[in-house]
UniProtKB/Swiss-Prot annotation:
Protein name per UniProt: ATP-dependent protease ATPase subunit HslU
A molecular function GO annotation: peptidase activity
Function: ATPase subunit of a proteasome-like degradation complex; this subunit has chaperone activity. The binding of ATP and its subsequent hydrolysis by HslU are essential for unfolding of protein substrates subsequently hydrolyzed by HslV. HslU recognizes the N-terminal part of its protein substrates and unfolds these before they are guided to HslV for hydrolysis.
Species this chain originates from: Lactobacillus helveticus (strain DPC 4571)
Family note: Belongs to the ClpX chaperone family. HslU subfamily.
Keywords carried by this UniProt record: ATP-binding, Chaperone, Cytoplasm, Nucleotide-binding
Residues annotated to bind ATP: 18, 60-65, 280, 345, 417
A GO BP annotation: proteolysis involved in protein catabolic process
GO cellular component: HslUV protease complex
């Protein structure tokens, strides 16, 4: 993937996020500095650490979206965690190291996807060969087992493996007739003529969730994976269309072709050098003026987070992971506190401070119309599925934006999220009646917005509950 300059990164962010230019500029610089670091000598690379960011601003102004889009631009492993989910060591709750384990898990998923894409052509060939054999099976002949084989089958059952009686204990004989039939099936398969035909395949049974595995995972161990590697794989039969069966078989063949040790190693490197951890609601772990046991625990969480942010090694089931060069982005509303209320050591680990501004009416107008995935474009696409062309006049858009701004000012300010609740209420009848409407076009005007939302806006109690 081509390296993008800070200006190019900001330009991409502008396609999805309105305003907040200072925040976009700061994260773009932090991201590009990673590329600069990789061009230096190994010794200098080790010395240069990421400049972590602390974003302060009301809810719904784009803090999370900036970080999420940033990660997608460079295809970096990204996890979002909430600071309130963590507890001090010794208390019930998630330990802070779990954020690093989650990051590595995401990196493994990304690396596995990349490797699967690399081997997909060969895996597809093997999957098609299996489909041909299933659609044109050979002549079955009973396989004679010697006494030693019977003993091995019995031991397999005792160890938890599949019952030999349920397995395919027949030998397949491929006659000339079967061979010709398979050639015919292969030709039809390549032309896509058998996609809807059903076929029965054997697939590995997914391991059941085990609470003990989760507990072991928090200690960097995965007993479930260890046992799955030792114990025989159980298989179940599933009847699927050829189209769906091919995808399942491609996945199974891909797993056989890739080297998971390499995947895990690359995932760890990817996490260490490119990983982004977004810590939301960091203001909620600031202790208040009145100290009690709960407040002490909040400060304890800060002290537990500190070594992760400043650089340490965390044991995961894929191997030890260094957090020295992971980029941390913390965010919070700081409505009842300020960043300087964090413990001094943690403040020092977030040297770049960015304040995000509350959204104005003009911002709401742009949010409704400009982004690639804007809310109006989403509703227009939904109605298009019913064969209806949905049109919003500029006056209607201005009115919706004004209502969102006024409701935020009069009640709790939830930023751009207010637009979703307003639009859902505004278009409730249209969405309900849509499939039965015969008209090909619906225009949302300012008068329609007034009619649908006027009574709710005038009644403050209804506004709080509905909008």
């Amino acid at each position: 993937m081509a390296i993008k300059t800070p200006k190019e990164i900001v330009k991409i962010l502008n396609e999805y996020i309105i305003g907040q230019d200072e925040a976009k500029k700061s994260v773009a610089i932090a991201l590009y500095n990673r590329y600069r670091r990789m061009q230096l000598s190994k010794q200098m690379q080790h010395e240069i650490t990421p400049k972590n960011l602390l974003m302060a601003g009301p809810t719904g102004v784009g803090k999370t979206e900036i970080a999420r889009r940033l990660a997608s631009i460079v295809e970096a492993p990204f996890v979002k965690v909430e600071a309130t989910k963590f507890t001090e060591v010794g208390y019930v709750g998630r330990d802070v190291e779990s954020m690093v384990r989650d990051l590595v898990g995401e990196a493994v998923r990304m690396e596995e996807k990349d490797q699967f894409a690399r081997v997909k052509p060969q895996a597809t060939k093997e999957a098609n060969k299996q489909l041909v054999r299933l659609l044109a099976p050979g002549v079955k002949r009973e396989k004679r087992e010697n006494q030693m084989q019977q003993m091995q089958d019995m031991m397999s059952m005792l160890m938890g493996g599949a019952n030999p009686n349920n397995q395919n204990n027949d030998q397949e004989e491929v006659t000339d007739e079967v061979r010709n039939e398979r050639m015919d099936v292969a030709e039809k398969l390549n032309k896509g003529l058998l996609e809807d035909r059903e076929v029965t395949i054997e697939v590995e049974q997914a391991p059941k969730a085990n609470p003990m595995s989760d507990m072991m995972g928090q200690m960097g161990m995965d007993m479930g994976s260890m046992l799955n590697d030792i114990m025989p794989k159980k298989k179940v039969k599933r009847t699927l269309s050829v189209r769906d069966a091919r995808e399942v078989l491609i996945q199974e063949e891909s797993r056989k072709m890739v080297d998971y040790d390499t995947i895990y190693q690359r995932a760890i490197e990817r996490s260490q050098n490119n990983g982004i951890i977004f810590i939301d609601e960091i203001d909620k772990i600031i202790a208040g003026n009145k100290r009690n046991s709960g407040e002490v625990s909040r400060e304890g969480v800060q002290r537990d987070v500190l070594p992760i942010v400043e650089g340490s090694t965390v044991n995961t089931k894929y191997g030890p992971v260094s957090t020295d060069h992971i980029l941390f982005i913390a965010a919070g509303a700081f409505a009842e506190s300020k960043p300087s209320d964090l413990i001094p050591e943690l403040q020092g680990r977030f040297p770049i401070r960015v304040e995000l501004n509350a959204l104005t009416k003009d911002d709401f107008v742009k949010i409704l119309k400009d982004p690639q995935n804007s809310l109006l474009k989403q509703y227009i696409a939904l109605m298009k599925a019913d064969g209806i062309k949905l049109i919003f006049t500029q006056e209607a858009v201005d009115k919706i934006a004004q209502i969102a701004f006024d409701v935020n000012q009069g009640t709790d300010n939830i930023g751009a999220r207010r637009l979703s609740t307003i639009l859902e209420k505004l278009l409730e009848d249209v969405l309900y009646e849509g499939p039965d409407m015969e008209m090909g076009e619906i225009t949302i005007t300012e008068a329609y917005v007034e009619e649908k939302l006027h009574d709710i806006i005038m009644n403050k109690d209804l506004t709080k509950f509905i909008l």
